[in-house]
Amino acid sequence: MYPHSLFLGLTLYDIFILVGVVAAFLLADRMTVKRGFSVSLQRIVIICALSAVIVGYGSAVLFQAFYNIAERGKFVIDANTGATFYGGLIGGGGGVFFVFFFAGKHFCKDNEAVKRFPDMLDIGACCIPLAHAFGRLGCLTAGCCHGRETDAWYGINMYNYTNGAGEEVWHRVVPIQLFE
């Protein structure tokens, strides 16, 4: 839809991802307070969320690089590699489990981290889809993933490529991100 940079090199994709992550962090903070988590466990939840973002993004790019082997014929991680949701979910989830139980064992009293783990899963079940929804809207604005070309009423114009004459070529496609 609009894959161009707006300001400071940021695109709408970057802005939507940032809004999604901030919204998920704020929701996690609100839910930990409402559920009565101790201050030390709240800090651990924030560290878990940060580790999920960092490790999740790294694994999302890594998983996409494996998918790209079929297209490029070699394993390459560069600016065009992209990211996959499932790679981020697996890596981010693994990072959260490790940090939550390791830090919980060392910094929480009375085994609170283990007792509150079901609550932590509930919080994650709310925050992950929230961040993902904003991310999918960002993906829609980037025009990186879409369905087939269509003439249906629900099709939207998306940037496809720039031809040899330097003109942008747009196609009406199925907006898969809006259906997820």
Task: Give the location of each predicted region.
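Hydrophobic, membrane-interfacing alpha helices
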Residues: 1-179
